Amino acid sequence: MQAGSNHVDIPKLTLVATIKGAGAPGSISAGARPTRLVPGQWWQASSVLPVVDQQPGWVLVRLAQRPNGSAAWIPAKDVSLAADPYYIVINLGDRRLHLYKNGKEVANFPAGIGVPSAPTPIGQFFVALFARAPSPAYGAFVIVTSAHSNVISDWQESGDAITAIHGPLGSDAAIGTTGAAVSNGCIRLHEPDLTKLRPVPAGTPIEIVE
């Protein structure tokens, strides 16, 4: 299925890989000598990574770490595989988040996106984990994604600038029904809309398009 004018291909299912143990050796090609360790946890949550390719005994997975778009081949024996029916498309042009399940759109919401000086990054990412909201203004929870700001390297001395999906942070009026550019790159949703993303599991693909 294709979504919107950007012709995003929406799969019915996405294969996701959960890293077993402390980590798995990552290589630039299947069977090559490892060049990195793909950690079994990131921000104290299990690493659940979308699979983008397979070869006998190997899977190519997206990574949550910088730079954006990172991927690695890891041995299939070091992961457990599952199918994920969800897919998220964030269209910066219409300032909306679209949620799909089994290839069909089930919801879409107006979204607060990055301002021109701190734009929301474009590309293919995924849900890395659900985190506790640091304050009620962030909503019931924060969805940490694998996307990182291209213009901010260290947000509030956190050591990184990760793009998250969370509550409105006081910008409900600005977001309204049409969305708005109000953030430093994160995606802000009205609280009732955010809670509808609760069933989405870690590893769910997120495609951010212009």
Q: Where in the sequence are the language-model features?
A:
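Beta-loop motif signature
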Residues: 1-50
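Exported/periplasmic cell-wall-interacting domains
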Residues: 65, 78-86, 115, 124, ...
